[in-house]
Amino acid sequence: IGLVGGVGNTANWVGLADVKLMYYGSDVSELSEDDSRFDVRDGTYGTVTVRQNLLSGLWNMVCLPFDLSSAQVRKYFKEVKALESVELAGEDCNLNFGNMRDMVAGVPYLVKVAQTVSVQTYEKVTIDADAVSSGATVVSDGAVTARLQGTFQKVVPYGDNVYAYEPNVFSKAETGTEIKAFRGYLELEGVFPKRLNLY
């Protein structure tokens, strides 16, 4: 890369230092919680739109394929929490969530929105398709292990101890329960609790 210089353009070249080329793919990418396949290429995009219904006044689950800075988080979310620990207390299983400022690709979060949102739009974000595997949150107290797994496409999780999330509550998933894209579900190992509490 160079700049042509000199009067009359005499083919003198000046090199540029500290240059970075960025791939923006198609300038706009649109994602939806109803997507059955996640086939977006990794890379930085000028604009990414996420079609997802988030209800005001409730804790919604969100798992995005790109990082968000604290400034980007505040655009739509007034509160964000991530799973930090799990505790077995008799017949109860307590899931403890802590406040977060940033959001990491592939990690499922509980979020609150100031008003109901159906479309989110973000600029200059970098999509990482593999983050859905590496971003799963796993916590344990020795007696019970909880794995909060995000989704980038619709999935039907299998297992005896799988919980689907509806705003404010996890409930035992029936066989064949479909989890929407950009959400998440919970798997427990070592215990079948009567009650699952969120704190």
Model-predicted segments: where are they?
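Contiguous mid-protein beta-loop-alpha structural module that forms a pocket-lining wall or clamp
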Residues: A82, E87, Y109
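A short, polar beta-strand/turn micro-motif
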Residues: S26-Y76, N96-N168, A173-Y199
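Short beta-strand-plus-loop segments that form exposed binding edges in beta-rich domains
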Residues: G2-W13
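Extracellular beta-strand elements of beta-rich domains used
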Residues: A17-L21
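Predominantly extracellular/luminal cell-surface or secreted proteins
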Residues: V4, M22-Y24
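Short linear interaction motifs
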Residues: A89-N96
